[in-house]
Amino acid sequence: MQDAEAGRSINLALAARGLNALRQVGIDSLIEPLLVPMRGRMVHQQDGRTDFLRYGQRDDELIYSVTRLGLNQILLAVADDIPNLRLNFEQNAIGYDAPDRTVHVRDETDGSLYQVEADPLFAADGAGSNIRRSFDGSDTFGGVETLLPHGYKELSIPAGPRGEYQLASDALHIRPRGGFMLIALPNPGGDFTLTMFLPNTGENGFETLSDEASVIAFFEEYFPDAAPLIPNLCDDMLNHPLGTLGTVRCRHWHDRGNVLLLGDAAHAIVPFHGQGMNLAFEDCVLLDRIINEHQDDWPTVFARFEAEQLANANAIADMALDNYIEMRDTVRDPKFALRKALAFELEKRLPGRFIPRYSMVMFHADIPYLVAQQRGEIQSALLEEFTSTANSIDDVDLDAAASAVKNRLPPIDTVRNDLSARRS
């Protein structure tokens, strides 16, 4: 079997939705050695101060850092052992002929072209999906690709001389600087994968960091504590590929019973909520359930899948964009920590009604993304209202805030029961 291709940046964040999918197919134990648990964010201010912000209140509310390459290798090895599945590498699906239901393929090893009959076709060919683009000009999918004016480059902090971590290993490290940020995620070997997110152009953009002097000056000003830990800083910043950040949204994901878009081909999102992989794995869980219910009635299967998941994908796409602003900017505001403290207090008092939006997304696989977004908007307004004139949690009228939660948010079990009734 061919090795899984690396070449892509940004460590993956495995959360409840992804773990749920891996457990359902029985391979979570294979993935476990690759995982590094993270309890929260370590925010590094420009003046050297650090603040640790927990993701959740319970000890089991963790997010796991995992390298893309390691996870890909295990998933491909498992797939390779399935008797009726054949893996073909370096075969590029370059288009789709709807009337004939055939995929046009180019063999990248020799440039030869051939066709494959596909009835139906599950198209999981990425954000730049050629299958999806084959329908451009029609109303079949209505795909729209939107790029951020920001990009990213991968850097690294090696393990220390004794193989030790040079930063706390149980945190996602963020250095927020308003319009840009540097993040670091731990790997099992004691090293960290860093990702530098910057505007593509402008004063503090990749375009202006064009030589060693500009890179060194930039890091000395904005990331003075990180620069000494990155031995290949200039080489990596100047020579590593610049990654793009974008969102794919579609009006539809299927062409009757013929084609179904899956994963990034249907709903690529920016990485700032760590949910792209988790959303794709959730797709698999949902699709498996619907296929079990309807077997090979593909028009019904595809329509049901779209009806249940498309709005959720749009919701997490929005929340991921929101989280970019939070990570690079809002998290620096003392009010952010106060709102988080109030959210935790309300969750303690009313766990059946108030779950922070971040926790709903990351730790509650049974709460749809759309529900998390909708409840999160109500909660955000409530948190803003009760902290607007407060300087600490002691200044907040907690009883009044709890009463407001009861008035504005139905019990979360009511939502769960409604969803179960609709699916049955």
Task: Identify the role of each PLM range.
Residues 2, 130-131, 268-270:
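Catalytic P-loop NTPase motifs of RecA-like helicase/translocase cores
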Residues 3, 7-78:
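Active-site-adjacent segment of FAD-dependent monooxygenases/related oxidoreductases
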Residues 6-9, 205-210, 272-276:
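Short, solvent-exposed loop/turn segments at secondary-structure boundaries
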Residues 33-37, 223-238, 295-304, 313-318:
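Acidic/histidine metal-binding catalytic segments
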Residues 77, 82, 91-95, 100-245, ...:
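Conserved FAD-binding catalytic core of PHBH/FMO-like flavoproteins
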Residues 86-88:
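General small-molecule cofactor/ligand-binding pocket signal
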Residues 122-123, 155, 241-332, 368, ...:
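Conserved mid-domain beta->alpha element of the FAD-binding
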Residues 289-424:
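C-terminal helical "tail/cap" subdomain of flavin- and related membrane-associated enzymes
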